[in-house]
């Protein structure tokens, strides 16, 4: 019985008196999703083998055989020729079994001084580190596309909103740079997360470390880790880094979702501020006229998906005692899907933003509605000595009158304005209308962080310089 089990390749089979149920095999196997870790698994194994040889734990001949066998396996995987076996449960045992088949006993010595517990923790960190770097690049691409569009629209005026009500005029460039700020913070979070990802668990073995004279720091250096995990129990059981990454990814998607909501609104014929290129839209199977912004709509939906993965990982870890538990097999699919979703979304959004057509006339027309320069009139009165609360009340009265007449504040004549605001008439001169123009309103906010066109250009320049950091 034992020899038959060994032929099937189960690494623990000598301990049991009956073979594993086929149902249990399918239930516990992870190879058909964790095989994406194959190349980092090979990299980790080669670093481990090199250290074992340097420490005289395995021979130089064994190391040479392992390196030769791993090169062949890597080629098979890259060419799609590797035969993954359900019986071998996961990526680690599949590769080890193939290595042993190729090089014999030297392959059996590879696992000396390590466990799959520290092996998989190392693989995930190696893989995620690379994906964080990729996502950082994609965030830069999206930020760059937004900066380009912002620079092109530093003078384009649209209404700024609070509570989805017209508030004050802003430049479209300023509005876009708000999203650049969000995605810049996302990039910072990814960099911060990477620092905690980049610690080596290998050497912790199953949970207690190993009795072999290993050199963990040498392996860390070979694999590009900043250091080692300091506690063997924590090293094999920690998934904080995966949760932290997924939380950062959820914020990326939240920012994408907020932007998506505005894109959908702006593209609506009732608003008509922008048009999204046809290649990013779909039509209707029944309504011939439709052009639907499916990409931003789907991004809103996918945000819920990533948020769900975050909750799944938090829930996965909340009841686990030290050290490693099989529960942790469930960390990979949420993590993999989060990476795929965020990367795909960022890539398509960078391309979509570059293809947006802006409609400045529609934006300007909307900014002329809703008394968007009312605050400027109040500020005008304050600068002439009126307390702000009194100015606020006077302008609110003027807005009420104009609203009833269906006109804007700028449509009043000077005499009408003085007549409607007798208590402040002595403060109002003909220059008041300079404050009521959209251009005057945005130009007056020329301070760092303000919406004035000169500040938008300066902010865009600074944001572009930050892309390389």
Curated annotation (Swiss-Prot):
The organism's place on the tree of life at top rank: Bacteria
Catalysis: reaction(s): 2-(N(omega)-L-arginino)succinate = fumarate + L-arginine
This protein's record includes keyword DNA-binding: no
Subcellular location per the Swiss-Prot or TrEMBL entry: Cytoplasm
A GO term from the CC aspect: cytosol
Pathway annotation from the record: Amino-acid biosynthesis; L-arginine biosynthesis; L-arginine from L-ornithine and carbamoyl phosphate: step 3/3
GO molecular function terms listed in the Swiss-Prot or TrEMBL record: argininosuccinate lyase activity
GO biological processes: arginine biosynthetic process via ornithine; L-arginine biosynthetic process
Keyword field: Amino-acid biosynthesis, Arginine biosynthesis, Cytoplasm, Lyase
Family designation: Belongs to the lyase 1 family. Argininosuccinate lyase subfamily.
HAMAP family, alphabetized: Arg_succ_lyase (MF_00006)
Name of the molecule in the record: Argininosuccinate lyase
Source organism per UniProt: Burkholderia thailandensis (strain ATCC 700388 / DSM 13276 / CCUG 48851 / CIP 106301 / E264)
């Amino acid at each position: 019985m034992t020899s038959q089990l060994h032929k099937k390749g189960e690494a623990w089979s000598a301990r049991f008196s009956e073979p594993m149920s086929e149902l249990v095999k399918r239930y516990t196997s992870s190879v058909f999703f964790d095989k994406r870790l194959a190349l980092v698994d090979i990299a980790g194994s080669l670093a481990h083998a090199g250290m074992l040889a340097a420490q005289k734990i395995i021979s130089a001949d064994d190391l040479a055989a392992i390196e030769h066998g791993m090169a062949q396996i890597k080629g098979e995987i890259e060419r799609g020729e590797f035969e993954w076996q359900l019986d071998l449960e996961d990526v680690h045992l599949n590769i080890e079994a193939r290595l042993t088949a190729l090089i014999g006993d030297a392959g059996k010595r590879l696992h000396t001084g390590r466990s799959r517990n520290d092996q998989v923790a190392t693989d995930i960190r190696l893989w995620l580190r690379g994906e964080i770097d990729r996502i950082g690049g994609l965030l830069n691409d999206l930020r760059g596309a937004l900066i380009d569009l912002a620079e092109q629209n530093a003078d384009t005026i649209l209404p700024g909103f609070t509570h989805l009500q017209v508030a004050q005029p802003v430049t479209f460039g300023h509005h876009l740079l708000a999203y650049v700020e969000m995605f810049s913070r996302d990039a910072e979070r990814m960099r911060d997360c990477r620092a905690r990802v980049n610690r080596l668990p290998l050497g912790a073995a199953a949970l207690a470390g190993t009795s072999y004279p290993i050199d963990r720091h040498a392996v860390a250096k070979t694999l590009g880790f900043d250091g080692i995990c300091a506690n063997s129990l924590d090293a094999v059981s920690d998934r904080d880094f995966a949760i932290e990454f997924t939380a950062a990814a959820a914020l990326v998607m939240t920012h994408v979702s907020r932007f998506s909501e505005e894109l959908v609104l702006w593209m609506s014929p009732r608003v008509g501020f922008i048009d999204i290129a046809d290649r990013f839209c779909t039509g209707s199977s029944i309504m011939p006229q439709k052009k639907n912004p499916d990409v931003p709509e789907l991004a809103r939906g996918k945000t819920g998906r990533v948020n769900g993965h975050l909750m799944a990982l938090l829930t996965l870890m909340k009841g686990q005692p030290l050290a490693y538990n099989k529960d942790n097999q469930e960390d990979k699919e949420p993590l993999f899907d989060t990476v795929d979703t965020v990367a795909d979304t960022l890539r398509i959004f960078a391309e979509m933003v570059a293809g947006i057509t802006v409609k400045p006339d529609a934006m300007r027309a909307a900014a002329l509605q809703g008394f968007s320069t009312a605050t400027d009139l109040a500020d005008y009165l304050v600068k002439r000595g009126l307390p702000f609360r009194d100015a606020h009340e006077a302008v609110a009265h003027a807005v009420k009158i104009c609203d009833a007449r269906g006109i804007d504040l700028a449509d009043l004549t000077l005499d009408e304005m003085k007549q409607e605001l007798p208590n402040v008439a002595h403060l109002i001169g003909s220059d008041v209308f300079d404050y009521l123009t959209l251009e005057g309103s945005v130009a007056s906010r020329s301070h760092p962080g303000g919406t004035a066109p000169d500040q938008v250009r300066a902010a865009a320049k600074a944001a572009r310089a930050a892309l390389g950091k």
